[in-house]
Amino acid sequence: NDKDELDINFLKDFIDKLELKAGGNPIQCRDYQFNAICEALVNKRNILLSPTGSGKSLIIYIIARYLLTKVKKKILIIVPTTSLVQQMYSDFEDYGLDSEKAIHRIYSGKEKSTKQPIVVSTWQSIYKLPKKWFDQFSVIFGDEVHGFKSKSLVMIMDKASEVPYRFGTTGTLDGKLVHELTLQGSFGPVYKVTTTQ
């Protein structure tokens, strides 16, 4: 579980080349977002505690795009609801990704296998799948992790124990220590994404 070396200037350059957009207009990666991205990439395991409005899906997007150039396997993004599967797909498209080509969506009844490099799924759709299914991933994001059932989350993360990059994101840790410890066991230490510099 060694930390990764990170070339900050290379990463800045990489983000510039993504030509990020929102609603068709160019946007910048803000400093606090950049800091969170660096933290996650160096640690390889983190829970990013990011308040509403801090551009959490943009942080996920940049980390995912960067790691796609570094890792040999796919990226799995797990969300609590079907509507969030759709939202993540649309957000990534909005930021400039060809989601149709790059993203496979899994929710009730959807095909579980794909050649696409990014898989977005509800946890309900995959927690009963065999360990072998999780072996195709190098990176796992749990988005809105406070909304996962602890038991199902542990089942997923146990099966994904070989996956080197593991990130959880949430706007809130509900103060239940047990759940928080479960999350940290699955994803690593909490990093507070502060929007005030």
Please identify what each model-predicted range represents.
Residues 138-139, 146-197:
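Post-DEXD/H (motif II) to motif III coupling segment of the RecA-like Helicase ATP-binding lobe
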Residues 1-3:
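Charged, low-complexity intrinsically disordered regions
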Residues 108-139, 150-155:
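Conserved helix/coil segment N-terminal to the catalytic DExD/H
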Residues 43-67:
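Walker A/P-loop
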Residues 7-49:
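Conserved pre-motif I regulatory segment
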Residues 73-81:
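Conserved RecA-like ASCE P-loop NTPase motor core of nucleic-acid helicases/translocases
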Residues 82-84, 111, 125-127, 146-147, ...:
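Conserved nucleotide-binding/hydrolysis micro-motifs of P-loop NTPases
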Residues 82-107:
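Conserved helix-turn-beta segment of the N-terminal RecA-like "Helicase ATP-binding" lobe
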